[in-house]
Amino acid sequence: MKSGTLEKKVDASSRQVAVPLTIIMLATASLHAAVDISSADAQRIGKRIWQNECGGTISGLTSWNVGENFASLGIGHFIWYPKGQRGPFDESFPKLIRFVSAHGAKLPQFLLPGHDTFCPWNSRVEFQQAVDSPKMKQLRQFLVDTIDLQTQFLIARLQDALPKMMAQASDRENVQRQFDRVASNAQGCYALVDYVNFKGEGTLPTERYHGEGWGLLQVLENMHGAQSALDEFAASAKTVLRRRVANSPPERGEARWLSGWLARVDGYAK
């Protein structure tokens, strides 16, 4: 299997896909919050998320976790369902493909328009058996070549998240205030981008256990300004994640992931 680390490959990605990561502004007609993410900060965010999701390795860009019915691909472990399989979680890999294609990335033949949009491997067993197949190697190389664009996609997701959350928030003023507090520095921008990729916006009705969500909206709604912004964000995220695991279907065995999830959000305050 081809291996490597993000430190060795990220510069190559930047050369192969020459799309600048510039200031990203989040705003709507009625909301005046903005998040400024410089090109350098964006690259650091992409590296940290790659480390979080894939251990910073090339092999980790193509994964299929035990107990899941979907592949997890790229630096953000974007979800890709096989044909006939669905679940409560938002399928993000096809959206990534459309995004990078629109920004000029060259797609592998089997990802071009007109081909089947479903994951070509039907199970984790099939996926693992194909780990060194030509198709998997093409996919892995494509993911290496588009690391910068994947980071842009992650940031764009945060850009789209705020109006979605505000449309559903029970206390819009508080959600706006907490978002602005967290977004006031580079570390907070990383926390927002990482969490919305990690656990979603919190706006999909399918992403609920016993009616309780676990996305960015729920984290912000649980904040009230009692601590420093990043300390409170991390504490609120841990509360939301513990609640998710407590509410989760037993057959998913989500408790096995909780310690890793909590360690990840602890990093937001450091």
Model-derived regions: residue spans:
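Bacterial N-terminal signal peptides that target proteins for export
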Residues: 4-20
